[in-house]
Amino acid sequence: MVKVMLGIISVTLIWGYTWVAMKVGIHDIPPLLFSGLRLFIGAVPLFLILFIQRKKLSIQKEHLKSYIIMSLLMGLGYMGILTYGMQFVDSGKTSVLVYTMPIFVTVISHFSLNEKMNVYKTMGLVCGLFGLLFIFGKEMLNIDQSALFGELCVLVAALSWGIANVFSKLQFKHIDIIHMNAWHLMMGAVMLLVFSFIFEAVPSAEWTYQAVWSLLFNGLLSTGFTFVVWFWVLNQIQASKASMALMFVPVLALFFGWLQLHEQITINIILGALLICCGIFMNTFTFSRRKV
């Protein structure tokens, strides 16, 4: 259990700062290109680890479909859509919206993992929805279409991440974690780079020091290292319990965004973040009844 706690803490700290690093990176590099390179950089050291450990690199034929689905969910569905939407949303707010993921996980797990909904989880879902209303409210009232579009993209990415978490627990429980992550990152990278080549003006990328640093941080730490740790944690404890720890990530992201990027933290964002964190807690904490 100590290893699980250390894994959760390391993931939380790294992912808390990831949003600032991403915002810095996509300022100079188109979002799909940034995402594709990030996944590629994250995948390379994982393949090296497999090679050093003399583990089989190829994918078994019967598992190929699962790897492709995982790549679509985490590559295009999560990383691609998230980074594209982040162009229009502050880093801290992006994190708050992405970490509605545990609420999606709880709902999906009810139907696929037999982790049943109860009154507390239902209350948590309601809290999360009200939190989203607080965050979306300003853009909906002011008809800020670009910000609203970006926020909806981030929510779609959160849903895709939630589906991927449950899918990994169903399909990859007995498959080597490093092997699974190496391949779904590499396959996702190829997909994103193809989309970038088709839809983005790649020559517009500016390879500044900040952009290169952001890519390395996001690729090696935020992707390669943390994805392995996170999916390992998911195999050790309930998916919903693991997701509860992630409520601290948006709090750190809001702080880092305010500290480094001078992003504004409004009362709506604070209330929305609190309600979403409350929703995550209600969805994932195990409430026990005392016998009288």
From Swiss-Prot:
The gene is yoaV. GO terms for cellular component: plasma membrane. The lineage of its organism: Bacteria, Bacillati, Bacillota, Bacilli, Bacillales. It is found in: Cell membrane. InterPro entries: AA-Vitamin_Transporters (IPR050638), EamA_dom (IPR000620). Its main location: membrane. Belongs to the EamA transporter family. Residues 13-137, 159-285 form the EamA domain. This is Uncharacterized transporter YoaV. It is a multi-pass membrane protein. Keywords: Cell membrane, Membrane, Repeat, Transmembrane, Transmembrane helix, Transport. PANTHER family: INNER MEMBRANE TRANSPORTER (PTHR32322), S-ADENOSYLMETHIONINE_S-ADENOSYLHOMOCYSTEINE TRANSPORTER (PTHR32322:SF18). The chain crosses the membrane at residues 6-26, 32-52, 68-88, 94-114, 123-143, 147-167, 182-202, 214-234, 242-262, 265-285.
